[in-house]
From Swiss-Prot:
Protein name: NAD(P)H-hydrate epimerase
Catalytic activity: (6R)-NADHX = (6S)-NADHX; (6R)-NADPHX = (6S)-NADPHX
Domain of life: Eukaryota
InterPro entries: YjeF_N_dom (IPR004443), YjeF_N_dom_sf (IPR036652), YJEFN_prot_NAXE-like (IPR032976)
Pfam families the UniProt entry points to: YjeF_N (PF03853)
Organism expressing this protein natively: Anopheles gambiae
Entry EC no(s): 5.1.99.6
Lineage, top ranks: Eukaryota, Metazoa, Ecdysozoa, Arthropoda, Hexapoda
Length: 229
C-alpha cells in the first residue's frame, strides 16, 4: 500500500472533484461517516461514550462535524469544539445539522481539567493534509490540551500539528491512540507509535487508484473502513 506525499494527496483530491465529479459535501459525508464507524469499532461507547470532537476551519473540521452527527446515532455523546467558523453554506449546514440533533457546538476552548473529568475520548479533526507548520496562535490553547491529555486521541487523516510527510517534529506533538487515514494513508502515518490505524473513505475509483499506484487494501463486505494495524 502506498503512502501519499502532500502533493499527491492534494492531486488525488483535485481529481476526485474535477475528473470524477464528486462534490465536496458528498466526499465529506462519506469520509465523516467512515470515521464514525471506525471510532465505533475501536472504542466501546460503554467506556468512551462522551466524546470531545475538535474541529478546524477546513475540510478536516467538516469531516469532524459529520462524524459527530453519526456518532450521536451510535450511543456516543459528542461535544464539538468549533472555534473558527466560516461563511460557507456547507459548513453552516453541518453545524446546524449537528445542533438540530442535540449536539453542543462551542467556540470556547475547553479547560484541560474539565476535559479529563468530562470525556472518555477526543477526536482531533483540526488540520488536514494541507497543513504546514507552525500552528496558528488561535489554535495553540486547544493543542496544549491535546498535548497534555491522558485521554485517547483519534486523529482524522493527519495528527494535528504533524508535518504531513515527516510526522512529529517536536517532543510536544500530540501522539494519537488511533489514526483514521482517509482515501489513502499519508507519509506521516509511518511515524505512528503503538497506535491503531484505520483506512476510511471507501469511494476511490479503480482508475484513480491505479494512476497513483495506491494498492489499497480490500474493504470487507459492507464495511466503511479497513483496520491496518
Amino acid at each position: 500500500m502506498k503512502y501519499l506525499n502532500q502533493q499527491e494527496a492534494i492531486s488525488v483530491d483535485e481529481e476526485l472533484f474535477n475528473e470524477y465529479k464528486f462534490s465536496v459535501d458528498q466526499l465529506m459525508e462519506l469520509a465523516g461517516l467512515s470515521c464514525a464507524h471506525a471510532i465505533a469499532d475501536a472504542y466501546s461507547p460503554d467506556r468512551s461514550n462522551k466524546v470531545l470532537i475538535c474541529c478546524g476551519p477546513g475540510n478536516n473540521g467538516g469531516d469532524g462535524l459529520v462524524a459527530a452527527r453519526h456518532l450521536s446515532l451510535m450511543s456516543f455523546v459528542p461535544y464539538v469544539y468549533y472555534p473558527k467558523r466560516t461563511d460557507k453554506e456547507l459548513f453552516k449546514n453541518l453545524q446546524h445539522q449537528a445542533e438540530s440533533m442535540g449536539i453542543t457546538v462551542s467556540v470556547d476552548c475547553p479547560a484541560g481539567e474539565w476535559v479529563e473529568a468530562e470525556f472518555g475520548l477526543i477526536v482531533d479533526a483540526l488540520f488536514g493534509f494541507s497543513f504546514k507548520p507552525p500552528v496558528r496562535e488561535s489554535f495553540r490553547p486547544i493543542m496544549e490540551v491535546l498535548q497534555k491529555t491522558k485521554l485517547p486521541i483519534v486523529s482524522v487523516d493527519i495528527p494535528s500539528g504533524w508535518d504531513v510527510e515527516l510526522g512529529p517534529q517536536t517532543d510536544c506533538d500530540i501522539m494519537p491512540d488511533c489514526l483514521i487515514s482517509l482515501t489513502a494513508p499519508k507519509l506521516c502515518a509511518k511515524h505512528l507509535v503503538n497506535a491503531k490505524h484505520y483506512l476510511g473513505g471507501r469511494f476511490v475509483p479503480g482508475k484513480l487508484e491505479e494512476k497513483y499506484a495506491m494498492n489499497l487494501p480490500a474493504y470487507k463486505g459492507r464495511d466503511l473502513f479497513v483496520r491496518l494495524s
